[in-house]
């Protein structure tokens, strides 16, 4: 029995136009005629396929078994990494032989993927679509960005994937900056409080030194003039009597009957000589330089104060405290003003002054002298 393959006859018939027909006959007599056109390769036969990174990523996302860690989004034009930890520890070693999630994101950035949602790991590319695997060949690896304005505008509302790693670092730096600013403000407040305390302490020290100097000058003046202390005590007693008289007349009611005051002035004298002791005339004629408050008090009470009780000027009344004490202004005026004829009438030996200065040396701000 003959082999059927040997019965095939190939005939070529030439035509004037240079074309030809190829006829192939089989045992059943059928013939196949093909145009005499040179064969061409299939479209895309020699084109390079999509990069392995894209194909592996597509397979990983399209796999229904990995939906717990990564899956397509609801719009099917992006994919979401739901569990970055499981994605890095389980899926990346299986598909890419490493477990570095940051490296995977950087690879996505080089192929033009963008982070869609800043609050989750959702990535998108216009040619990375669900059910359209053939579009992966259109995704090309990007060249290094030239940082031009056109590239920045092309990003649109998306966020660059490569910047994801800096977000946490930026947040941490912002928190550190806020803490440092709060610490700086606190230190500045403490510095201001310290300066205020130092200023108050300096003022107190200066006041103490000034009082010590005034005390030394006062004691030196007493040593020069022994009568000065007696005169000062007598003036102090006169002031106290004057204050007592004024305070009692202020407390006395106008409709109260006449009484004898502390300075010995009787109401009977006022009744016998009303013209002589008229309050207004007595103040104008007998008293010169009386403070207005003492003058009003005497007139309101309807009584009369002897002129010798008012032998104190307004400035001295202001220097007397509420309890009859003398303030700093009194001491300054007392030490600055001179007593006429005191130094000539009561000379003091210079040696006594030196002894006093040595004994009172401990009052100075520098501490006690070496002689003590």
Swiss-Prot record:
InterPro entries, from UniProt? HSF_DNA-bd, WH-like_DNA-bd_sf, WH_DNA-bd_sf
Q: Does this UniProt record's set of keywords contain Transcription regulation? A: yes
MF (Gene Ontology): DNA-binding transcription factor activity; sequence-specific DNA binding
Q: Where is this motif: Bipartite nuclear localization signal?
A: 238-253
Q: Which sequence ranges form a coiled-coil region, renumbered to this chain?
A: 165-252
What Pfam families does the database record attribute to this sequence? HSF_DNA-bind
Where mainly found?
cytoplasm
Keyword terms, alphabetized: Coiled coil, Cytoplasm, DNA-binding, Nucleus, Phosphoprotein, Stress response, Transcription, Transcription regulation
Subcellular localization is given as: Cytoplasm; Nucleus
Q: Where is this motif: AHA?
A: 328-337
- Please provide one cellular component term from the Gene Ontology annotations of this protein: nucleus
The known PTMs are summarized as: Exhibits temperature-dependent phosphorylation.
* Gene Ontology BP annotations: cellular response to heat; regulation of transcription by RNA polymerase II
Q: Where is this region: Disordered?
A: 247-274
Instruction: Outline the inducing conditions.
Output: By heat stress.
Region entry Hydrophobic repeat HR-A/B: which residue ranges?
Answer: 173-223
Q: Where is this motif: Nuclear export signal?
A: 356-363
What remark about domains does the record contain?
The hydrophobic-rich region (HR-A/B) corresponds to the oligomerization domain. AHA motifs are transcriptional activator elements.
Q: How does it assemble?
A: Homotrimer.
Q: Which PANTHER family match?
A: HEAT SHOCK TRANSCRIPTION FACTOR, HEAT STRESS TRANSCRIPTION FACTOR A-2B
Q: Which family does it belong to?
A: Belongs to the HSF family. Class A subfamily.
The protein's role, per its UniProt record:
Transcriptional regulator that specifically binds DNA of heat shock promoter elements (HSE).
Q: What is this protein called?
A: Heat stress transcription factor A-2b
Which organism does this record belong to?
Answer: Oryza sativa subsp. japonica
Gene designation: HSFA2B
């Amino acid at each position: 029995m003959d082999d059927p393959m040997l019965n095939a006859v190939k005939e070529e018939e030439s035509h004037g136009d240079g074309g030809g027909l190829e006829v192939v006959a089989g045992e059943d007599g059928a013939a196949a005629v093909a145009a005499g056109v040179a064969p061409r390769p299939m479209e895309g036969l020699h084109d390079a396929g999509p990069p392995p990174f894209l194909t592996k990523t597509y397979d990983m996302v399209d796999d229904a078994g990995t939906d717990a860690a990564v899956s397509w989004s609801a719009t099917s034009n992006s994919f979401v990494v739901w569990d970055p930890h499981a994605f890095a520890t389980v899926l990346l070693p299986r598909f890419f032989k490493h477990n570095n999630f940051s490296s995977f994101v950087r690879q996505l950035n080089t192929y033009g993927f963008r982070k869609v949602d800043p609050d989750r790991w959702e990535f998108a590319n216009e040619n990375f679509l669900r059910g359209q695997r053939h579009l992966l060949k259109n995704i090309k690896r990007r060249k290094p960005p030239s940082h031009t304005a056109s590239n920045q505008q092309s990003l649109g509302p998306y966020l660059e994937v490569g910047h994801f790693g800096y977000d946490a670092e930026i947040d941490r730096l912002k928190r550190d900056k806020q803490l440092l600013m709060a610490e700086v403000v606190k230190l500045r407040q403490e510095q201001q409080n310290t300066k205020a305390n130092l200023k108050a302490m300096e003022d107190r020290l200066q006041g103490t030194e000034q009082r010590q100097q005034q005390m030394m000058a006062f004691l030196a003046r007493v040593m020069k003039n022994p009568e000065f202390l007696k005169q000062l005590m007598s003036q102090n007693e006169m002031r106290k009597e004057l204050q007592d008289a004024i305070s009692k007349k202020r407390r006395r009611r106008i409709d109260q009957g006449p009484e004898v005051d502390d300075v010995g002035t009787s109401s009977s004298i006022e009744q016998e000589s009303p013209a002589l002791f008229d309050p207004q005339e007595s103040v104008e004629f007998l008293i010169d330089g009386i403070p207005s408050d003492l003058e009003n008090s005497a007139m309101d009470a309807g009584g009369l104060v002897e002129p010798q009780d008012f032998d104190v000027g307004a400035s001295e009344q202001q220097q007397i405290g509420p309890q009859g004490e003398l303030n700093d202004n009194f001491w300054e005026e007392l030490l600055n003003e001179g007593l006429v004829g005191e130094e000539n009438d009561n000379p003091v030996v210079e040696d006594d002054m030196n002894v006093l200065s040595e004994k009172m040396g401990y009052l100075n701000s520098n501490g006690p002298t070496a002689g003590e």
